[in-house]
């Protein structure tokens, strides 16, 4: 069965989700809603400064987007309730505007005829959040779910392996995060986050993140044991998690690496990667995994106190897991 998917919001994640869908035979994008017109949408899809030119034919016919010969409905509705997803038989909507992050707002897609909704960000209410490979088996048929954040998708698989094998007493996470669309090119007003309004290309900017605390929702036994912060840095894509934890059961750094490597080849294959080479951030660009553990970057103070490093393409890795979650909730 091919899953029919609509995208609401054709920004960075919306477009990378679209690109990722082209590599799958179980998912078809049948509709896109954004305030962009179809011609500009085609241009934004065709050319990408981070991921390169789109591999395929992109054109516009009669106000619709035609990609590799397949017609995709284009709409420009501000209110999701008016989207008439039923007219194109949409199974799942990818809600990637960043605006509709709660059950009551995302439910407008259901009212418009979609069967299910995946929110591409942490939910603002108790809408369940899922990280593939970590808690996806707890899905109970909910119509509206969240794919959490890109950082939570990097951190949670790593935390799961550590907690399962050695136990986590407590931990602090820092994500060194690439620039995102919410930042300013030059200093500008940012009433809620003064530092966040400073020029993205000129500064390393300390910021808040709920990614570590969110792991407590994904792995309940870690609730209250993890918190974290972010540094926004002037790179276009690829971020890295620095996780420092105190372990319940002692383990050498090699034992920890061995456990992560085994998980990357076993139950977390396709989600968690393992690298034992001298890589840098650009080497991860385009990697579909959500977490790539760097065995050469971590350090151990003693057998109970360790710092681990894991990379992630915060666009590609996350967007690929959106599709994996879609496939999971439509089984």
From Swiss-Prot:
Subunit (UniProt): Homotetramer.
Record-listed E.C. numbers: 1.2.1.12
Subcellular location: Cytoplasm
Protein name, as recorded: Glyceraldehyde-3-phosphate dehydrogenase, cytosolic
Family: Belongs to the glyceraldehyde-3-phosphate dehydrogenase family.
NCBIfam families reported in the protein's UniProt record: GAPDH-I
Keyword presence, Oxidoreductase: yes
Site positions for Activates thiol group during catalysis: 177
Pfam families registered for this protein in UniProt: Gp_dh_C, Gp_dh_N
Binding site for D-glyceraldehyde 3-phosphate: 149-151, 180, 209-210, 232
GO BP of this protein: glucose metabolic process; glycolytic process
Active-site feature positions: 150
Binding site residues for NAD(+): 12-13, 34, 78, 314
Highest taxon listed in the record's lineage: Eukaryota
């Amino acid at each position: 069965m091919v899953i029919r998917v609509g995208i609401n919001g054709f920004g960075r994640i919306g477009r990378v989700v679209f690109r990722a869908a082209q590599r799958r035979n179980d998912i078809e994008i049948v509709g896109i809603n954004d305030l962009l017109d179809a011609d500009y949408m085609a241009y934004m899809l065709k050319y990408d400064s981070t991921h390169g030119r789109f591999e395929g034919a992109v054109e516009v016919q009669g106000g619709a987007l035609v990609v590799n010969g397949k017609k995709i409905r284009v709409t420009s509705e501000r209110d999701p309730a008016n989207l008439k997803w039923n007219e194109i038989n949409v199974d799942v909507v990818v809600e990637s505007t960043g605006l509709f992050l709660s059950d009551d707002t995302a439910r407008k897609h259901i009212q418009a005829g979609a069967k299910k909704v995946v929110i591409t960000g942490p939910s603002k209410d108790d809408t369940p959040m899922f990280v593939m490979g970590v808690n996806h088996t707890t899905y109970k048929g909910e119509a509206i779910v969240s794919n959490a954040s890109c950082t939570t998708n990097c951190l949670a698989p790593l935390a799961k392996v550590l907690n399962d094998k050695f136990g986590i007493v407590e931990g602090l996470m820092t994500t060194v995060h690439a620039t995102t669309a919410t930042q300013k090119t030059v200093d500008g007003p940012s009433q809620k986050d003064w530092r966040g309004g400073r020029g993205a290309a000129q500064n390393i900017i300390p910021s808040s993140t709920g990614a570590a605390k969110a792991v407590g929702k994904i792995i309940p036994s870690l609730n209250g044991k993890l918190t974290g912060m972010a540094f926004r840095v002037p790179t276009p894509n690829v971020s890295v998690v620095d996780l420092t934890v105190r372990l319940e059961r002692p383990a050498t750094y090699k034992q920890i690496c061995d456990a992560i490597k085994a998980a990357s080849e076993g139950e977390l294959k396709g989600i968690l990667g393992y690298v034992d080479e001298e890589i840098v951030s650009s080497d991860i660009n385009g990697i579909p995994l959500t977490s790539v553990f760097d065995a050469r970057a971590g350090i151990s103070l003693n057998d109970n106190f360790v710092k681990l490093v894991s990379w992630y393409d915060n666009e590609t890795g996350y967007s690929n897991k959106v599709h994996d979650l879609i496939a999971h909730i439509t089984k």
